[in-house]
Each structure stands twice: as structure tokens, then as C-alpha cells.
Design a protein with these regions (language model features):
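Conserved nucleotide-binding/hydrolysis micro-motifs of P-loop NTPases
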Residues: 26, 39-43, 118-120, 146-148, ...
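Conserved C-terminal RecA-like helicase domain
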Residues: 72-182
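Long, hydrophobic alpha-helical segments
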Residues: 220-264
Length: 264
């Protein structure tokens, strides 16, 4: 676990030539972000892991028509793999165990789960409530809606006013809302300083990955740092993103083998 990804991951990296992420932490503007891999907890087989690796390869490829068509096929496979009921059950059980025993969550209990898709976000949500029926105010799904959504989805997702209300509650440290399940929303430009832990169940890379994990690096009271918990093998993509988007951090962490540095 306690492997520091950077000495602070934040929006400051946009000005990387002047103010890199290492400097941000040294100046007290952000907190360190730590990485923990729990991919092994899902007990995914080799074929599944290879499919996930292909997803990262496609992200790195040029978006020509052939790649786009291949991506559609791989996305369909990823949905089936990551949305498997047994895998979701294992995932949620492990997330809850980690959440309830992680000292970083003792401060305010704010955590975010990044789901691969809207369907998977709903599965995670319902599984959490099956385990903890009394958590209806503690956990929420925050994602876009569609007029094709089933009625039961609409009741959970709500309208724009409902999403705005959820945002206010999540930023309020005294609110009972502690866990937000997201897909794309809230991963950029949404700051909750008390947010301590992000559970990642979605392949991400580059700019999008850096923006996402920056959600947990804000300064708050006695918060020592943010924690990114990985369930889909983002380590290599994370290392590459750090090399691409930082200056001094590239020197500090560019040669680090993230996969070996973390503890399981």
C-alpha cells in the first residue's frame, strides 16, 4: 500500500513547466496520493486480464476507424467481464471491507467508486444496499441519465436538481452521504477536500486518469494524503501518465516499477 504515486496530484500539472506536482505538496497546496492494488482480490483469470490490457492498448492507439471498430468490440467484452454478477459481488464485498477498515476514511468517511459503465454503477449500488439496507442516505449514484433508462434507474439517478443536491451533500462533511458511485461525472473540476479514497473499477489513462486521481489530493484538516485503490490494473497507465504530465515528478518517479512497488 503506502507507495506514494506523487507528492501531490492536482490541477496544477497544467502549468507543469512552472509548477509541478512535487512542488505543490512541498508548498502545502496538495497532499500526497498513495496507490494500492487490489486486483488480485477479484481473482480474474489470465484471459480476463489480457482483455483489460487490450483496453489500455486501444486507449493509447490512434483513433482511426479500425481502432474505433475494434474498440467497440473490446468495450462489449469488458462490459460482460467487469459486469459479471459474481465479480461485482466480490468487488463490492472487498470495497466495503476496505472502506470500513481504512484509517483514511475515519476523518469524514468520504469515498468515491469509479465504475466502468452506467450499468455496472447501478449493479454496485444495488449490491451495496443488499449488504447494507440502511445505507440509502450514505451511498448514491451520480451519473448522466437517458430517456431510455428503465424507471427504476430514473428513481436512483434523478434529475439535474437532484444531482445538484447530491453535490452539496457530498461536499458537506456533516452530511450522511459518504460514498459516491460515478462513471464520468465528478472526475474533473469537482473538489471535495475531505475526499480521501477513490476505488477504481474502470480502465483510464493519460489526462483523464490524472484528473480523476487528483480528486483525492486536496488539503483537509489532518488528512495525510489521498488513496487510490486499483481493481483494474491502472499501474502502468498511471506511470506513463506521470511521465507525460509532470516535470520534476518524471525524474522522481519515472523509473519506478509501480507494479512491484505496491503491496498486495
Amino acid at each position: 500500500r503506502d507507495f506514494c504515486l506523487s507528492r501531490g496530484l492536482g490541477d496544477v500539472y497544467k502549468r507543469q513547466d512552472i509548477y509541478d506536482m512535487t512542488q505543490a505538496v512541498e508548498d502545502g497546496a496538495t497532499r500526497p496520493v498513495y496507490y494500492e492494488s487490489r486486483v488480485v482480490k477479484l481473482k480474474l483469470d489470465e484471459n480476463t486480464l489480457r482483455t483489460i490490457d487490450k483496453e489500455y492498448d486501444l486507449m493509447a492507439a490512434q483513433a482511426d476507424q479500425g481502432v474505433i471498430e475494434q474498440s467497440k468490440h473490446e468495450l462489449s467484452r469488458m462490459e460482460a467481464i467487469l459486469g459479471n454478477d459474481a465479480t461485482i459481488n466480490t468487488l463490492v464485498t472487498d470495497i466495503l471491507d476496505h472502506y470500513e477498515n481504512n484509517r483514511e476514511n475515519l476523518l469524514t468517511g468520504k469515498a468515491m467508486i469509479v465504475a466502468y459503465s452506467r450499468e455496472i454503477a447501478m449493479k454496485i449500488y444495488h449490491r451495496i444496499l443488499e449488504i447494507h439496507p440502511d445505507w440509502t442516505e450514505k451511498v448514491a449514484v451520480v451519473m448522466t441519465s437517458s430517456n431510455k433508462d428503465p424507471e427504476e434507474w430514473r428513481d436512483v439517478i434523478g434529475n439535474k436538481a437532484h444531482k445538484n443536491e447530491l453535490a452539496k451533500k457530498f461536499k458537506d462533511n456533516n452530511s450522511p452521504l459518504k460514498i459516491a458511485i460515478v462513471v464520468d461525472m465528478w472526475l474533473t473540476g469537482f473538489d471535495v477536500p475531505s475526499l480521501a479514497t477513490m476505488y477504481v473499477y474502470k480502465p483510464m489513462s493519460g489526462y483523464n486518469l490524472m484528473q480523476a486521481i487528483a480528486r483525492v489530493n486536496r488539503v483537509f484538516r489532518d488528512k495525510e494524503g489521498g488513496l487510490v485503490v486499483d481493481y483494474v490494473g491502472i499501474a502502468t497507465a498511471l506511470k506513463q501518465a506521470m511521465n507525460d504530465y509532470t516535470v520534476r515528478d518524471r525524474k522522481n518517479y519515472g523509473d519506478t516499477d509501480v507494479g512491484k512497488a505496491v503491496s498486495y
